[in-house]
């Protein structure tokens, strides 16, 4: 992952629901009201790159004894809801991660880092291990000359997020190269 990585750019542009803690003039266009202020407690979907900055920068204190609040507060995203977490814990290898979000792992690691969520990080690590075994199994079972994946592999590929698809491509290429090398011996 890097600065010019398209998957990073697309993941950072994923929108998350946020609530504003202050009324901010001139930002009404975020709600579809250009030229007007965005109201306090307004709920708006913002791209992750913008929301993460606004969630870490604090505004002015209204009273001396109060703690300054960040400009926005993240609302719990659907992709990390109890329903999704329970589905991951129940059977991670068969979960259709792509239908949840095409950049699930990238967003999950950013979310875990942003909120220091060790539980989410641990769940994602376990999920990666379980699903990587399945990805490797499908990648290694493909024939050397195969131009199209089998039906089972094609169905599995549709459930992968972008990181897992890159993993499949690399594992398939490594398996193909190993089979070609073994055939030459």
UniProtKB/Swiss-Prot annotation:
One GO term (biological process): double-strand break repair via break-induced replication
CDD domains per record: GINS_A_psf3 (cd11713), GINS_B_Psf3 (cd21693)
Species of the source: Eremothecium gossypii (strain ATCC 10895 / CBS 109.51 / FGSC 9923 / NRRL Y-1056) (Yeast)
Protein name in UniProt: DNA replication complex GINS protein PSF3
Gene Ontology cellular component list: CMG complex; GINS complex; nuclear replication fork
Organismal lineage: Eukaryota, Fungi, Dikarya, Ascomycota, Saccharomycotina
General function of this protein: The GINS complex plays an essential role in the initiation of DNA replication.
Claim: Signal is one of the keywords in the record: no
Subcellular location: Nucleus
Keywords of this entry: DNA replication, Nucleus
Primary gene name: PSF3
Keyword Nucleus: yes
Family as reported in the entry's similarity comment: Belongs to the GINS3/PSF3 family.
Assembly with partners or alone: Component of the GINS complex which is a heterotetramer of SLD5, PSF1, PSF2 and PSF3.
Domain of life: Eukaryota
């Amino acid at each position: 992952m890097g600065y010019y990585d398209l998957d990073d750019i697309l993941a950072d542009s994923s929108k998350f629901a946020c609530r504003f803690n202050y009324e901010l003039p001139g930002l009404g266009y975020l709600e579809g009201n250009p030229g007007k202020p965005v109201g306090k407690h307004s709920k708006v979907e913002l791209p992750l790159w913008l929301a993460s900055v606004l969630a870490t920068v604090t505004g002015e204190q209204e009273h001396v004894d109060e703690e300054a609040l960040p400009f926005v507060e993240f609302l719990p995203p659907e992709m990390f809801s109890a329903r999704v977490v329970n589905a991951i814990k129940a059977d991670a290898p068969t979960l259709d991660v792509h239908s949840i979000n095409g950049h699930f792992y990238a967003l999950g690691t950013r979310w875990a880092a942003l909120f220091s969520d060790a539980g989410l990080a641990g769940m994602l690590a376990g999920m990666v291990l379980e699903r990587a075994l399945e990805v490797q199994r499908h990648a290694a079972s493909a024939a050397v000359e195969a131009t199209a994946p089998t039906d089972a592999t094609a169905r599995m590929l549709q459930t992968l997020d972008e990181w897992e698809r890159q993993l499949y491509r690399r594992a398939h290429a490594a398996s193909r190269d190993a089979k070609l090398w073994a055939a030459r011996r």
